[in-house]
Regions:
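Residue-level marker of alpha-helix boundaries and capping positions
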Residues: 76, 175-176, 205
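A donor-sugar binding/catalytic signature common to diverse glycosyltransferases
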Residues: 194-198
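A short, acidic, amphipathic alpha-helical segment used as a generic capping/interface helix at domain edges
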Residues: 51-52, 56, 172-191, 210-213
């Protein structure tokens, strides 16, 4: 997230990528020793990462086009699957807006509670999902607090993403990436993106119906996308 936020504006080319590699190395070593996975350690790491990236000198006055990337999970994140779309946009000097992996995990977990609400039932999976969602939301708030305290824009929280899905009336569409793709599109348009690249597998019917089918409704969030 911070790489996408800062790299188009950095004064020293490559400085943001160096920070990413540094923290990837540090976190890998911590995970190898079974550390950094508890809530207290994660909150400390959130703060340290944000403080580290806040030292990068940037020129925010640059005119940079903000483009969102969303779509089916594998195609969205895998350069092999999307033909290095992210690199292509970055080479064009675009500010890439892309949600991370955690919202997808929250979406999958929350699918149990959505099904319970739709069918008027109460299952053990649904109850457990609510507890897990609450835990992840707490960590998400801590992460956003660290971002804001260091002068960065907070990431869109899951509650906001879900509200977009509710507006479409499609929270029951939980096969594959379901309503999440459309919600990410709305989030991107609301947060200033003038274009959205939707990456979908050619033969994935679920992605085409849940995502492409609501493009017109997503465009209601902006008039010039």
């Amino acid at each position: 997230y911070l790489y996408n936020e800062l790299s188009p504006y950095e004064l020293k080319k490559g400085e943001t990528l160096d920070k990413v590699r540094l923290w990837n190395s540090r976190l890998s070593r911590l995970f190898e020793h079974g550390k950094a996975a508890d809530p207290i350690s994660m909150c400390v790491i959130f703060r340290k990462i944000c403080e580290s990236f806040a030292t990068i000198n940037c020129d925010k006055s640059r005119s940079v086009k903000k483009v969102a990337v969303t779509g089916e999970l594998y195609i969205k994140f895998c350069a092999l699957g999307n033909g290095e779309t992210e690199k292509y946009l970055r080479d064009l000097g675009c500010h890439i807006y892309m949600s991370g992996f955690v919202p997808y995990i929250m979406y999958l977990t929350d699918s149990c509670t959505n099904d319970d609400n739709i069918y008027g039932r109460k299952t053990l999976a649904g109850v457990g999902a609510k507890v897990l969602i609450a835990y992840m939301k707490t960590l998400w708030c801590k992460m956003n607090s660290a971002l804001v305290q260091n002068g960065f824009e907070p990431m869109e929280d899951y509650r906001s993403l879900k509200s977009y899905g509710e507006n479409f009336g499609c929270l029951g569409e939980t096969m594959g990436d379901g309503w999440l793709i459309g919600a990410e599109m709305c989030s991107a348009l609301k947060n200033g993106c003038k274009g959205v690249v939707m990456l979908l597998p050619f033969g994935c019917l679920v992605s085409h119906t849940c995502a492409r089918g609501i493009i017109k409704r997503c465009l209601l969030y902006t008039s010039d996308a």
